[in-house]
UniProtKB/Swiss-Prot annotation:
GO biological process terms on file: division septum assembly; FtsZ-dependent cytokinesis
Main location group: cytoplasm
Family: Belongs to the SepF family.
Protein name per UniProt: Cell division protein SepF
GO cellular component: cytoplasm
Cited Pfam families: SepF (PF04472)
Summary of subunit composition and partner proteins: Homodimer. Interacts with FtsZ.
Designated gene of the protein: sepF
Function: Cell division protein that is part of the divisome complex and is recruited early to the Z-ring. Probably stimulates Z-ring formation, perhaps through the cross-linking of FtsZ protofilaments. Its function overlaps with FtsA.
Organism: Bacillus cytotoxicus (strain DSM 22905 / CIP 110041 / 391-98 / NVH 391-98)
Subcellular location: Cytoplasm
Source taxonomy: Bacteria, Bacillati, Bacillota, Bacilli, Bacillales
Alphabetical list of InterPro entries matching this protein: Cell_div_SepF, Cell_div_SepF/SepF-rel, SepF-like_sf
Keywords assigned: Cell cycle, Cell division, Cytoplasm, Septation
Length: 156
């Protein structure tokens, strides 16, 4: 008796062979479906409307506040930063402070403005404008300041 006859006698029946052949054919069909590109289907095309730049009037009013401040000590820097966090632009006049404290406030506010994605611009000698991300600063002010600025004594 050959090995194939023994194997056939103990393991494979004609029904099992037929089931295995059917599974093999089914697997081949699935592989062909995966290899073929999908059929193109007609999908109705809807026209995409461009976004409208509509802003409610209340939102526009709220984001258009400008706060004018004249701090006298460095401890007021946190209050200025709170205005910026509240999405309000701030104009700061630092002329009534010592230069050292004014530099510290500008450094602090520069970090704050960077953290909220805003901007800081110098408007004049010791006068700055800090804006949050919802306010854009357009244009520039020429640097025709006093003689102190021209002699480069302490420029910051």
């Amino acid at each position: 008796m050959s090995w194939s006859k023994v194997k056939y006698f103990f393991f494979d029946t004609p029904e099992e062979k037929e089931a295995a052949q059917y599974a093999y054919e089914k697997e081949q069909i699935e592989m062909k479906k995966q290899q073929e590109p999908p059929e193109q289907q007609d999908v109705p095309f809807t026209k995409v409307q461009p976004k409208q730049n509509v802003v409610s009037i209340e939102t526009a009013k709220q984001s258009s506040k400008v706060v004018l401040l004249e701090p006298r000590t460095y401890s007021e820097a946190q209050g200025i930063a709170d205005h910026l966090k509240g999405k309000r632009a701030v104009v700061i006049n630092l002329q009534r402070m010592s230069t050292d404290q004014a530099v510290r406030i500008v450094d602090f506010l520069s970090g704050t403005v960077y953290a909220i994605g805003g901007d800081i611009q110098k408007l004049g000698p010791k006068t700055f404008m800090c804006t949050p991300e919802n306010v854009d600063i357009v244009g520039a002010i020429s640097e025709l300041f006093g003689e102190e600025e021209e002699t480069n004594i302490k420029r910051w």
